[in-house]
Each structure stands twice: as structure tokens, then as C-alpha cells.
């Protein structure tokens, strides 16, 4: 039997700033356990901290940003998205196919 290999993805997740540190850790764990529950593997998590949002989302002006590199079967992505939509702690998410895991993320500073 041929072993399935997963596609590499980069996920961007923005969590509510109203969460305590412990609640934020649990919300992030909920996202990562969802990936592993569908047979995926979390490769790298980048915590980008608290940042200002480009626009208001559900009354929030700021959010906690995380970037997660993971592998999972492509057919599992739609199920993960369904779970993300039901997660009230998650303000926004985006999942993209990735070509490689970035060890360091660099962003240009935007003028205020």
C-alpha cells in the first residue's frame, strides 16, 4: 500500500486580543490538534505577537498573529476551514500552499 504524503501549507491565524495568555495557548492548540487529527504534521509555528489590524474585525482593532507551517492531505483542508469558521477565538485565517518552511519571517514595517 502506498503511503500518502501531505501537501505543505502555510497558515496565517489571527486570534482575538481579548483572550488571556492561557486561553490563547489553548486556542492555538485547538488549531494544531485539528491539523494532527486529520493526519497532518505541524512543522513550525511563528508567533508574531500582538499587531494592529488593517481594518476592524468584529469590533477588534488588534489581534495576535501566528503563522504555522504544516503538512496535511489536500482533502483535509476543507474540513479544517469548517472548524476554523466555528472557532469564535479566531478572527481571521488564511491557508496557502507553501514551497518550503521559512525558519525566519521578515516583514517590512508599515508607516503609521
Swiss-Prot record:
Disulfide bonds: none annotated. The keyword Plastid does not apply. One of its GO terms (cellular component) is ribonucleoprotein complex. InterPro entries: Ribosomal_bS6 (IPR000529), Ribosomal_bS6_sf (IPR035980), Ribosomal_S6_plastid/chlpt (IPR020814), Transl_elong_EF1B/ribsomal_bS6 (IPR014717). GO terms for molecular function: small ribosomal subunit rRNA binding; structural constituent of ribosome. Pfam families: Ribosomal_S6. Gene3D superfamilies: 3.30.70.60. Keywords: Ribonucleoprotein, Ribosomal protein, RNA-binding, rRNA-binding. The keyword Nucleotide-binding does not apply. One of its GO terms (biological process) is translation. HAMAP family: Ribosomal_bS6. Belongs to the bacterial ribosomal protein bS6 family. Binds together with bS18 to 16S ribosomal RNA. PANTHER family: MITOCHONDRIAL 28S RIBOSOMAL PROTEIN S6 (PTHR21011), SMALL RIBOSOMAL SUBUNIT PROTEIN BS6M (PTHR21011:SF1). This is Small ribosomal subunit protein bS6. It comes from Chlamydia muridarum (strain MoPn / Nigg). The lineage of its organism: Bacteria, Pseudomonadati, Chlamydiota, Chlamydiia, Chlamydiales.
Amino acid at each position: 500500500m502506498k503511503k500518502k504524503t501531505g501537501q505543505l501549507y502555510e497558515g496565517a491565524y489571527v486570534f482575538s486580543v481579548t483572550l488571556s495568555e492561557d486561553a490563547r495557548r489553548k486556542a492555538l492548540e485547538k488549531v494544531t490538534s485539528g491539523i494532527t487529527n486529520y493526519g497532518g504534521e505541524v512543522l513550525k509555528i511563528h508567533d508574531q505577537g500582538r499587531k494592529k489590524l488593517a481594518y476592524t474585525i468584529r469590533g477588534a482593532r488588534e489581534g495576535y498573529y501566528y503563522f504555522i507551517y504544516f503538512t496535511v492531505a489536500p482533502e483535509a483542508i476543507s474540513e479544517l476551514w469548517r472548524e476554523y469558521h466555528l472557532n469564535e477565538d479566531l478572527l481571521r485565517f488564511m491557508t496557502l500552499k507553501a514551497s518550503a518552511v521559512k525558519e525566519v519571517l521578515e516583514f517590512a514595517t508599515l508607516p503609521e
